[in-house]
């Protein structure tokens, strides 16, 4: 946990799914992961990311040039009854992923597995801020330089139909 100016104490997990992610429960922020809150979710996500990078050192065990949290994944209860959780991933200079984020889903699967909340070959469905979903599973556990890691499989497809009522 860290202290973030204007937000207070924030609890989070750091996980790797291609980049380092900070995973933050939206409930502690008093927010919902919803497209109507996108601007505020981005603002808060960047504050959290920047404070983490000022106070916590992360380094990939095989690639020391990967040494910062690049993305903040804010997760929430799903609105889709088939999904397990819902998220928005904030990155860059204020962008967010409209999909559940492939690398973010990997990071979430690794965190859930490490906490004993999902087992080998159990399906996990992640809903995005726009309502799209990704499915993933932990296939096996491995070691990466003596650090527990997972191998996962993910399958997904997208259907987009633009309309004035959908962001």
Where are these regions (language model features)?
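Active-site proximal loop and beta-alpha junction motif in alpha/beta enzyme cores
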Residues: 1-167
